[in-house]
């Protein structure tokens, strides 16, 4: 019913409805295959199936669905998940691959290092090489357009 609701609400033909299945850890491979087949039959444009435990399960899902709908792979840094490169994921038949949390984890580690340096030395001078410059930070965050809006709508 949720897929039908999404299809009924879709106004843009390019809007992609991705069916997500997290049942592997709880119910196992057979249930995942049944659920994903139901999603495909219900009209899902893409499948995002969390497969974490083994290459056999990953290959089974890919084999079953890669020719039916595009598959999405969520690349997890978890030690529970086989460490696959984007090329390996593509070779299995997945069409999209998301490295969803790696940059946040790297940023958190750098924040810890910077804050430890500040705590120990009272300055950030020892970690300046790990930081981007102010101009780059402003550009990344498109601060010039925000400044333009501030000036346009200032009271």
Residue ranges and their predicted role:
Residues 102-155:
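Extended, intrinsically disordered, low-complexity segments
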Residues 1-75, 79-99, 106-109, 115-116, ...:
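Alpha/beta enzyme core
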């Amino acid at each position: 019913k949720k897929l039908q609701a999404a299809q009924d609400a879709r106004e843009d033909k390019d809007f992609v409805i991705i069916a997500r299945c997290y049942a592997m850890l709880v119910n196992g491979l057979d249930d995942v295959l049944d659920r994903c087949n139901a999603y495909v039959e219900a009209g899902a444009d893409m499948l995002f199936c969390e497969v974490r435990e083994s290459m056999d399960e990953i290959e089974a899902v890919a084999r079953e669905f890669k020719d039916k709908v595009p598959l999405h792979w969520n690349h997890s840094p978890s030690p529970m998940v086989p460490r696959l490169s984007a090329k390996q994921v593509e070779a299995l038949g997945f069409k999209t691959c998301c490295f969803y949390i790696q940059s946040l984890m790297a940023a958190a580690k750098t924040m810890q290092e910077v804050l430890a340096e500040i705590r120990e030395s009272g300055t950030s001078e020892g970690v300046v090489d790990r930081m981007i410059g102010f101009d780059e930070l402003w550009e990344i965050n498109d601060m010039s357009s925000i400044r333009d809006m501030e000036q346009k709508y200032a009271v």
